[in-house]
Amino acid sequence: MQVQLISEVSEFEALAGEWDALLERAVVPSLFLSWVWQRTWWQYLGNGQLALITVRDDAGNLVGIAPLFRQTADGLHELSLVGCVDVSDYLDLIVDGCCVEPVYRAVWDCLSGPHAPSWVEMNLCHLPLSSPTPAI
């Protein structure tokens, strides 16, 4: 698996077509996870630093996205799902059904690795009941 941490809006924008194609194959598809919704939310309501994590298989196909951002509250760095504050329901990681465990493992390795943004808390709000995220 190839993992990339994205912090620039231009890189976020470049994912549009691949993002929605992945969402069609996702374990938990949701309007609130579509590229248009996520990008619009970030543009108008997002604050902090983007920390999107993309995961690609060995052939370069996008198989996972952790749509995260980092903000600071009371001096502590928190990672949250894009859309987590105000308006959005049914948020989650976007994971191709063929690769659930390897994608989650790759995301966790990225978040706990030396190049990860510093954080002490993760806010995974509005997860649907069908999400595999809490179990993994």
Where do the PLM segments sit?
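N-acyltransferase acceptor-side catalytic subdomain
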Residues: 1-136
